[in-house]
């Protein structure tokens, strides 16, 4: 890729970031750090949803090189090569539409990188004024760089399932860390008794949700959503024939065994069935947590609203998960299922951060009159 194309690509990333940055700096709020943290969290959530859309539309190899598209910064100037690839393999992964989807995903990802770089710079420049350590923002910048590397390997290793799944998990981790940072800038009052009752259960629930997201990512990256054709049974059986060893082999390429032979259907069934079975554990854990939160809420509107939000997201996940099977994996429902999982992780990360801050007796725990 030429230096000129790299400069154009960098400019497009800056242009993507300039819209939220302009909004932060033009608004009259004096606490620009707080506003930047929240807008970066929002854009990162959007990036995760668009990443799911990219994966679900089979656009991950719409541009088979990285960081550009056939050595160009955009599909327009790479149009001749894209059309040639499509003509050579009409049912292949390269089309003009898929190339645009993939490159838009990369532009947004670069924009998030610029936002986090700006956030880190602001955290260090105003560390005395903010009275916060700049190291969390620095860790975020390191994480987004690692995430970018996995984004590159996703393409260069031809959608290898373990790489794509780690890429997804790092994205959710980045979102949750941004949420934790955002929670510290938006203090809400939580009683000491509620903290004592909820600190452990919330952290445990967050770990369970991360585990289920990992399993869901493994289903998606292996295209195992329709391996079970019915619900609540799986291909007419409560426990169908499954091949766990091959299904959960982390070293194999997409759709193949290590020896190059096709992955058996039983392996895909195992992947799907484990995700479905673990969903029962998630429902029990989050349902129990929601009830504990309501019992501990007392006069805390935040805890009550969070509990009901958790119930709503849990219902959304169950409904969209079942619908993916019953309605043969419609795109809109599949994207909503991915977005709901990310939203659930973010909700728990926000709550976990506020509970942790209260437990450490930071000012965030005692502040009243939280800002919207």
Regions found by a protein language model. Give the residues of each.
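Small-polar-interrupted transmembrane alpha-helices in polytopic inner-membrane proteins
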Residues: 43-50, 135-153, 204-212, 305-326
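N-terminal signal-anchor transmembrane alpha helix
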Residues: 36-58, 208-219
């Amino acid at each position: 890729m030429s230096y000129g194309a790299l400069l154009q690509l960098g400019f497009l990333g800056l242009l993507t970031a300039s819209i939220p940055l302009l909004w932060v700096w033009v608004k009259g709020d004096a606490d620009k750090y707080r506003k930047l943290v929240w807008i970066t969290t929002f854009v990162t959530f959007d990036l995760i949803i668009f990443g799911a859309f990219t994966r679900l539309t089979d656009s991950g190899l719409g541009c088979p090189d990285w960081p550009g598209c056939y050595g160009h910064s955009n599909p327009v100037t790479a149009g001749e090569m894209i059309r040639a690839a499509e003509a050579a393999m009409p049912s292949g992964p390269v089309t003009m539409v898929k190339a645009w989807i993939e490159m838009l995903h990369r532009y947004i990802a670069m924009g998030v990188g610029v936002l986090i770089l700006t956030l880190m710079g602001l955290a260090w420049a105003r560390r005395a004024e903010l009275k916060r350590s700049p190291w969390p923002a620095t860790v975020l910048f390191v994480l987004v760089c690692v995430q970018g590397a996995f984004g590159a390997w996703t393409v260069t290793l031809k959608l290898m399932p373990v790489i794509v799944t780690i890429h997804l998990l790092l994205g959710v981790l980045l979102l949750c860390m941004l949420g934790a940072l955002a929670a510290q800038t938006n203090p809400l009052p939580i009683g000491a008794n509620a903290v004592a009752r909820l600190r452990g259960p919330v952290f445990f629930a967050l770990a369970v949700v991360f585990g289920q997201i990992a399993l869901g990512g493994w289903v998606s990256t292996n295209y195992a959503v329709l391996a079970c054709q019915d619900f609540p049974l799986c291909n007419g059986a409560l426990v169908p024939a499954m091949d766990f060893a091959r299904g959960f082999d982390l070293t194999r390429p997409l759709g193949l065994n290590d020896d190059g032979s096709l992955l058996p259907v039983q392996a895909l069934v195992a992947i799907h069935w484990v995700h479905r079975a673990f969903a029962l554990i998630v429902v029990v854990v989050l349902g129990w947590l929601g009830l504990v939160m309501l019992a501990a809420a007392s006069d805390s509107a935040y805890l009550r609203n969070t509990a009901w939000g958790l119930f709503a997201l849990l219902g959304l996940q169950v409904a969209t998960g079942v619908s993916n099977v019953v309605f043969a994996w419609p795109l809109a429902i599949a994207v909503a299922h991915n977005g709901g999982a990310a939203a659930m992780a973010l909700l728990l990360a926000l709550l976990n951060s506020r509970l942790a801050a209260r437990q450490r007796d930071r000012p965030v725990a005692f502040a009243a009159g939280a800002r919207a």
